[in-house]
Amino acid sequence: MKRPMHVIRPATSEDAPEILAFIRELALYEREPDAVRASLSDILRDGWGPQKRFHCLLAESDGAPAGFALYFHNYSTWRGHAGIHVEDLYVRPAYRRRGIGKALLAAVAAIAIDEGCPRLQWDVLEWNTPAITFYEAIGAKRLMEWRTMRISDSALSLLASASSSGSSVDSPGAL
């Protein structure tokens, strides 16, 4: 029996509809099917516009879209280096347990090394034990003492309004 051929390649703007489909499938898997607000124009603007905000790799199995990894650069003040944050890693159910997820992460890891980034990081839902098991098997460590914090939408606007009500901000990075 012929083993399927997997190809990992950089996504192009022509892949934007497939990327959006992957994002929606991942949201469904993560029990948040109504949380996706991203549109095709958002993906095109932020992936291929003048201010590129993310990079994306696609996995194909025998020419069919099988999964993706979407990532962006961050910075560690403690390490004094840029790093890479993997925002989304997703492999369609029909293609799981074939090495595609590992191949996608390995490709992002190779990019990190090539770009002088000494680490990758990502978030995983506590209940997603298959993913946690996979990540630990490839050498990832859980950061038990860290918690992700997020502020968005109206709470973000409320916080931003505090900068114009009596406090002075000299630059976007000032605290």
Predicted regions and their residues:
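A short beta-loop-alpha structural element at the N-terminal edge
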Residues: V7-I19
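Conserved GNAT-fold acetyl-CoA-binding loop/helix
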Residues: L20-R45
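A short helix-loop-beta-strand connector motif used in the catalytic cores of GNAT acetyltransferases and
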Residues: R45-L58, H85
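Conserved beta-strand in the GNAT
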Residues: L58, A64-H73
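A short, internal acetyl-CoA/4′-phosphopantetheine-binding micro-motif in the GNAT/acyltransferase core
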Residues: L89-R96
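Conserved active-site alpha-helix within GNAT-family acetyltransferase domains
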Residues: K102, A106, E126-E145, L158
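Conserved GNAT acetyl-CoA-binding A-motif
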Residues: I113-D123
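Conserved beta-strand-loop-alpha-helix junction that forms the acyl-donor binding cleft
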Residues: W122-A131, R150-S154
